[in-house]
């Protein structure tokens, strides 16, 4: 498949999944060049292909827009997943995500923020600037562990929080998920036990399944986070090798652990010689005065692999993440060379240019303000239209709300009913291998709020009321 066909396929999937809705203006050709790292001609051919297939339309002097009735992609066949001793989550996740790919569906189930929140024009200028000075050596210079200037810029941002991490300890990856997967591979072998939260980010469950690892799900409170007593019991009973947790703005619950609990967590895992793989992709999306510290701040024995990215706070399309890997840095580099080889060189260089100015912090302040406003508006709409029996668990970060239905309602059944009205929600079953969270669902508040979203919440309230 040629590059322009690959880009066209990627955009078709974004339209089908609801990232781009009918009538939405797509990124301009120049903006798409910045996002994809492809040439202007390649992007132009991709857009022309999508236009010829009826997915988008061109408007003179205006740009490209998603067609009012974008062609629906055929449903992919459900691939059966072999049951592992601990994890079998992929089939259900695939079913739910595939069902909500229709662009006419309101994407409350989405895990992504609204792409219109990101500074595409500024990033485009950065990409154009580095393109003028890039050399043939750039690819070699940006092989693992990644661009030296970018690693230094990330290390400086750690230093702003009083955390000293050498650029040599940082490995640039293709997004946070690669950082997390490589971290798991570095400290485990197939068949090892790994602790996760219950509920947890479904990407963690998928990673465990793929690497043939066994999961221990530890009770996690919607406000207080992981139960440290239950965690210690698990550590006493099982030969645990790693613990994959989110300490800031946890997905799906939204809590942030207190500094005291983070310190206790790190000390407890160190006592049992268990590596903490800290998933910190939402750390910049806080609404309080000070940025919360990661658990890595309490790491005195090189026992925390801290993973994050720019995907949720700056630009998903660049797929740039990292892991502060400490003593595991060289092993993670070798693992990366055997899998993805390296992370996109133009994207790394563009981020170096962008981060060299004060634009990033200005963008983050604006992004946090917009997300807080959108979350408040969505929360108020949910309070207006949902029955009083529904509990809405609010938090001071990120763009998710966690909703609890009264017994005996089932969020999985509700999600299927909602889809018939072109509304998607993320039921609790997506975030756990058990049935503990069958009455819960995650709600994305990051998308621009309008009449369509208002009516969708109103319809959701009617569906719940009918089931009481």
Pin down the residues of each PLM region:
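N-terminal basic, amphipathic alpha-helical segments
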Residues: 1-128, 309, 333, 337-344, ...
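N-terminal small-domain helix-loop-helix segment of the aminotransferase-like
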Residues: 83-175, 182, 356, 424, ...
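Conserved core of the PLP fold type I
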Residues: 137-272, 284-301, 371, 461
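Amphipathic, non-transmembrane alpha-helical secondary structure
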Residues: 8, 12, 181, 185, ...
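Hydrophobic residues in well-ordered beta-strands that form the structural core
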Residues: 196, 217, 276-278, 351, ...
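Conserved glycine-rich beta-strand-loop-beta hairpin in the small C-terminal domain of fold type I
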Residues: 369-379, 390-404
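Conserved core segment of the aminotransferase class I/II
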Residues: 123, 300-369
């Amino acid at each position: 498949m040629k590059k322009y066909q690959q880009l066209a396929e990627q955009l078709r999937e974004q339209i089908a999944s609801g990232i781009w809705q009918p009538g939405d203006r797509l990124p301009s050709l120049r903006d798409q060049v910045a996002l994809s790292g492809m040439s202007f001609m390649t992007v132009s051919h991709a857009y022309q292909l999508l236009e010829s297939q009826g997915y988008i339309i061109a408007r003179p002097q205006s740009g490209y827009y998603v067609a009012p009735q974008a062609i629906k992609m055929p449903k992919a066949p459900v691939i059966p997943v072999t049951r592992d001793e601990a994890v079998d989550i992929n089939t259900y996740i695939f079913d739910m995500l595939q069902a909500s790919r229709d662009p006419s569906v309101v994407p409350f189930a989405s895990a992504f923020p609204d792409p219109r929140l990101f500074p595409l024009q500024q990033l485009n200028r950065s990409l154009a600037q580095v393109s003028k000075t890039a050399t043939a050596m750039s690819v070699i210079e940006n092989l693992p562990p990644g661009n030296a200037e970018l690693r230094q810029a990330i290390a400086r941002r750690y230093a702003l929080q009083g955390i000293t991490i050498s650029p040599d300890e940082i490995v640039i990856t293709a997004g946070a998920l690669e950082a997390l997967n490589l971290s798991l591979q570095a400290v485990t072998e197939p068949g090892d036990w790994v602790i996760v939260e219950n509920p947890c980010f479904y990407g963690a469950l998928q990673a465990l399944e793929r690497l043939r690892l066994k999961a221990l799900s530890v009770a996690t409170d919607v406000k207080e986070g992981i139960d440290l007593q239950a965690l210690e019991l698990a550590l006493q009973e099982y030969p645990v090798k790693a613990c994959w947790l989110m300490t800031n703005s946890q997905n799906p619950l939204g809590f942030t652990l207190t500094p005291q609990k983070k310190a206790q967590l790190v000390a407890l895992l160190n006592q049992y010689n268990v590596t903490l793989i800290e998933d910190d992709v939402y750390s910049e999306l806080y609404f309080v005065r000070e940025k919360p510290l990661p658990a890595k701040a309490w790491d005195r024995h090189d026992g925390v692999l801290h993973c994050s990215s720019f995907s949720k706070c700056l630009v998903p399309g660049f797929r740039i993440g990292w892991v502060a890997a400490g003593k595991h840095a060289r092993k993670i580099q070798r693992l990366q060379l055997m899998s993805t080889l390296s992370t996109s060189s133009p994207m790394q260089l563009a981020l170096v240019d962008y981060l060299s100015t004060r634009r990033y912090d200005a963008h983050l302040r604006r992004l946090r303000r917009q997300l807080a406003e959108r979350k408040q508006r969505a929360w108020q709409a949910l309070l207006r239209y949902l029955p009083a029996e529904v509990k809405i668990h609010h938090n001071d970060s990120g763009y998710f709300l966690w909703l609890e239905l009264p017994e005996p309602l089932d969020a999985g059944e509700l999600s299927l009913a909602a889809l018939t009205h072109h509304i998607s929600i993320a039921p609790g079953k997506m975030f756990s291998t058990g049935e503990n969270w069958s009455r819960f669902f995650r709600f994305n508040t990051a998308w621009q709020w309008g009449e369509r979203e208002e009516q969708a919440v109103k319809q959701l309230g009617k569906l719940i009321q009918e089931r009481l």
